[in-house]
Amino acid sequence: MEGANVNEDERKYLRQIKHIIDEGDKVIDRTGVGTLSLFGLHSTYSLRNGVIPLLTTKRVYWKGVVEELLWFIKGDTDAKRLSAKGVKIWDANGSREFLDSQGFKDRPEGDLGPIYGFQWRHFGAEYHGTDADYKGQGVDQLADVIEQIKNNPNSRRIILNAWNVKDLHQMALPPCHTLAQFAVKNGELSCQLYQRSGDMGLGVPFNLASYGLLTHMIAHVCALKTGFLHHVLGDAHVYLNHIDALKEQLSRDPRPFPTVHFEGRIDSIDDFTAESIILNGYNPMAPIKMPMAV
């Protein structure tokens, strides 16, 4: 059988999918689509030797992973600026119709509120829209994470937190991937991601690749190797209209994960560009279409 035993990590993800389809509780969720859901799943993915957990049993939108992460790192919250890069993944949540439905009738289209990037770079600052100057405001958690990894790598407090209770009511969508903790052991940087809500078909494949890439980027600027991505899921769910597509994915045998490297010596997390992030050896199977629940 093709690729037998070459990618046990991806099989962990596929086993989670099967477990949810077989054993999940049927829930009528916020979107009205309905899900099968389990609470409290965990998997570990190796990041050693440049490996990144970018699924191979379907094509994952790598450009979207990269551009969204760079957008987060900039502290940006404007879906239109991400869309201008050709990445439309936040367009639905930033649409006039969706913002109005959430009570944000006075907010410009595309303004998602103080979501991930704002919390990463300006935690605690007052949010005044996408174009305000937030320089020096709030806590730059991402810079603090990197400073601690460099200067206090044994700390148990190296945490990046997007769940700011004070700001939740201003967000177009509260954070699904809420908190990442980093740890340095034997010269390797590992990340543990807590995700309160995981759309296993569409969101989780993206999140695994994104936090795998973020860990590689932070390790690079800190002159460390990479270790592992530990992924903890709260509500892990399969949308009912994804079941057939995911059963098709379950029939596929994983190929080896690709690797990632960076062009040149990059010393600051803010200096990465899409062009400096190089993906190697990605050989996925055909895409599998699944509708996004908004």
Curated annotation (Swiss-Prot):
The active site is at 176 (nucleophile). CDD domains: TS_Pyrimidine_HMase. It catalyses: dUMP + (6R)-5,10-methylene-5,6,7,8-tetrahydrofolate = 7,8-dihydrofolate + dTMP. (6R)-5,10-methylene-5,6,7,8-tetrahydrofolate binds at residues 199, 293. It comes from the Eukaryota. GO terms for molecular function: thymidylate synthase activity. InterPro entries: Thymidate_synth/dCMP_Mease, Thymidate_synth/dCMP_Mease_dom, Thymidate_synth/dCMP_Mease_sf, Thymidylate_synthase, Thymidylate_synthase_AS. Its EC number is 2.1.1.45. The keyword Transferase applies. DUMP binds at residues 30, 156-157, 196-199, 207, 237-239. It holds the Pfam family Thymidylat_synt. It is an enzyme of class 2 (transferase). GO terms for biological process: dTMP biosynthetic process; dTTP biosynthetic process; methylation. Signal peptide: none annotated. One of its GO terms (cellular component) is cytosol. Keywords: Methyltransferase, Nucleotide biosynthesis, Transferase. Pathway: Pyrimidine metabolism; dTTP biosynthesis. Belongs to the thymidylate synthase family. Homodimer. This is Thymidylate synthase. It comes from Ascaris suum (Pig roundworm).
